[in-house]
UniProtKB/Swiss-Prot annotation:
SUPFAM superfamilies: PLP-dependent transferases (SSF53383)
Co-factor(s): pyridoxal 5'-phosphate
The protein's name: LL-diaminopimelate aminotransferase
GO molecular function: L,L-diaminopimelate aminotransferase activity; pyridoxal phosphate binding
Keyword Transferase: yes
Gene3D superfamilies: Aspartate Aminotransferase, domain 1 (3.90.1150.10), Type I PLP-dependent aspartate aminotransferase-like (Major domain) (3.40.640.10)
Lineage: Bacteria, Bacillati, Cyanobacteriota, Cyanophyceae, Synechococcales
Sequence similarity: Belongs to the class-I pyridoxal-phosphate-dependent aminotransferase family. LL-diaminopimelate aminotransferase subfamily.
Amino acid sequence: MVQVNSNYLKLKAGYLFPEIARRIKSFSEANPDAALIRLGIGDVTEPLPLACRNAMKVAIDEMGTNTGFHGYGPEQGYDWLREAIAKHDFQNKGCQINAEEIFVSDGSKCDSSNILDILGSSNRIAVTDPVYPVYVDSNVMAGRTGEANQSGRYAGLSYLPINAENGFAAKIPSEPVDLIYLCFPNNPTGAVATRAQLQEWVNYARTNSVLILFDAAYEAFIQNPDLPHSIYEIEGARECAIEFRSFSKNAGFTGTRCAFTVVPKGLKGKSDDGSDVELWNLWNRRQSTKFNGVSYIIQRGAEAVYSAQGQGEINALVSFYMRNAAIIRRELTAAGIEVHGGEHAPYVWLKTPDDMDSWGFFDHLLHNANVVGTPGSGFGAAGEGYFRLSAFNSRVNVDEAMRRIRAL
């Protein structure tokens, strides 16, 4: 009989969001008339920008002609999209990133997991706690951890707590690590990093030969012009960091799938024999072998994000969701609930009232307010006693959800 990858058996009972879906399904079957409002999983609700839709329609029509048909495209992405990304998202902000260092993909979730393919299994890994579950679970699946303890922490990982007491800013690891995941604006807490804070991380990484995997999926939601959007705005980051970006949240591409990863040329790791190896070469080889590229139609839609019309429309989308976040913050604060985040990110991170545990508060909101959120403990042991609400919903639903919560 074929053997399975037993590392999967080390995973906790269910990935956070499937467990939420299971509880919602059970509740809905018992209460079919309940009008649920979902402020849980970070899926967008507003339509794709018109500029993107029109570009995709043109691309579809092109695909219906002999001269305009496109089959397999470059695994790294079409040059015109990579050039638009490099210019707008990096070069215009003073970052020395060129188009060849951009790898277009179908999601930053995939990339942040797949990047492990090119990194050795003996690397010592650090994550914040709470943390986006994919970072941890993908390492468990790849056999890079031991078993989980009673609190859900896996042997072999270094956990860096972030909480209200430390301003949701992780401290530099006290033990040696080789690889660290950073996410700013942070999912789930909504915290942001200043230039000085990121410079401290970059300095640490360069001094200690650490690779930073930097998730900037929510950079478009930053409201303060003094805050960095990319780690490459920080001196020395090209030598120690890979960055993940996505069109999912700023342009509504959760259902159309387009993202990109930045791997600077000259960024190096060590081989088993101690020689230096460029990570760009390994990632390029990995993508060429395991990925067939994002469809031409979708990439044309993503390219339209960088048009004048597209920029105006995605800015409007971001403003809409950030207004929702402001409403959630205001109403929860008025209800006497301690809130964090929601100022530079579409997530509000709240302290559960009355010392309720995270899943207890989830069930409380589900059954008594018919509102769905995300329990903080699902993001890690340090998330216990916290809860995440997402600003990704209609204004009507956000207003109604807040009315229901305040009525509890």
